[in-house]
Amino acid sequence: MAVPKRRTSRSNTRSRRAQWKAKAPALAKCSRGHTIRPHTMCPTCGRYNDRQVLDV
């Protein structure tokens, strides 16, 4: 099994870990103007793609 020849420095470790960040979710507007995730039904008005799919 491979063993590291040298210890990884703290700055190298932290620089590598700095890339592990969560992305903000993409947001869209429903036809009534509410902010939703794309390709999902609006939980406020129950519409998807300008159609009523759920009675809220």
Swiss-Prot record:
A Pfam family of this chain: Ribosomal_L32p
Signal sequence bounds: none
Membrane-traversing stretches: none
UniProt entry keywords in alphabetical sequence: Ribonucleoprotein, Ribosomal protein
Bias kind Basic residues: ranges: 1-20
This protein's record includes keyword Ribonucleoprotein: yes
Cysteines paired by S-S bonds: none
GO CC entries: large ribosomal subunit
GO terms for MF: structural constituent of ribosome
Top-level taxon in the UniProt lineage: Bacteria
Keyword Thylakoid: no
GO BP field: translation
UniProt xrefs under InterPro entries: Ribosomal_bL32, Ribosomal_bL32_bact, Ribosomal_zn-bd
Segments of this protein annotated with the region Disordered: 1-26
Family per similarity comment: Belongs to the bacterial ribosomal protein bL32 family.
Name recorded for this polypeptide: Large ribosomal subunit protein bL32
Species, as recorded: Parafrankia sp. (strain EAN1pec)
Higher taxonomy: Bacteria, Bacillati, Actinomycetota, Actinomycetes, Frankiales
